[in-house]
A protein has these predicted regions:
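Hydrophobic, small-residue-rich alpha-helical packing segments that form membrane-like cores
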Residues: 2-103
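Hydrophobic helix-and-loop "lid/oligomerization" segment in the mid-to-C-terminal part
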Residues: 1-43, 63-64, 114-218
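Short alpha-helices
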Residues: 80-130, 138
């Protein structure tokens, strides 16, 4: 969602692909890459995965498609030969904080592309950082603090509807995210299509957001 919103705001023609984790696993896979590239895509940007996708990136390169990897998982012996690899612990980098969540790494790319500090995305960063169960220190602590402020001041309509369905009227804090919002969003991965989550978080219409929130709440 974070990078889709970023790229759309820059005028890019964007489509998203969320793999079925039961059929395709968590990381990139050759079948998905082939299907995406054959549809006419010329650039694939991964979020929270890809650092182990050496063969998949090689396939994409052979088919004329660039790949940008954003990931925070452990770097393997071989790093994919992607157009760019954005990772807080990249051996050729000197980033001072290596414990960013996957969404935090994606946020860094959004920041660079937009050339402004995209504070309007910090609600997503806060939710993703808490959900990823990374250390809430350093930048992660700042992201979560700023994101929670945004969630309380101007929550996305989908989040607002989800909280209303459960009669949660208190201020959102780390516990609200960790014990309610994040588990609800994670449960979407067990649905027939994880695209529900994308539609839910990007919903702008209250009616649509309520329908999606009810589906998630079931």
């Amino acid at each position: 969602v974070l990078l889709v919103e970023t790229l759309v705001s820059l005028g890019a023609d964007v489509s998203s692909y969320i793999p079925n984790r039961f059929e395709e696993g968590y990381g990139p896979n050759k079948d998905a890459f082939s299907k995406i590239i054959k549809s006419g895509i010329s650039l694939i940007i991964t979020v929270d995965n890809g650092i182990a996708g050496v063969d998949e990136v090689e396939l994409a390169n052979s088919l004329g498609c660039d790949v940008i990897i954003t990931d925070h998982h452990k770097i393997q012996d071989e790093i994919p030969k992607a157009y760019a690899v954005i990772h807080p612990e990249h051996p050729e980098g000197q980033y001072p904080f290596g414990k960013l969540a996957g969404v935090g790494v994606a946020f860094k790319l959004a920041h660079a592309l937009l050339e402004i500090y995209p504070d309007f995305l910090l609600d997503l960063v806060a939710i993703g950082t808490v959900a990823d169960m990374v250390s809430l220190t350093d930048e992660n602590r700042i992201f979560v603090k700023q994101g929670i402020e945004l969630l309380n001041e101007d929550p996305r309509i989908g989040i607002k509807m989800l909280l209303e369905l459960s009669n949660i009227t208190t201020n959102i804090d780390e516990q609200t995210i960790g014990f309610y919002i994040a588990p609800k969003l994670n449960s979407i991965g067990r649905m027939d299509s994880a695209k529900v989550g994308l539609s839910f978080l990007m919903a702008e219409d209250a009616y649509d957001a309520k329908i999606l929130a009810e589906k998630i709440e079931e």
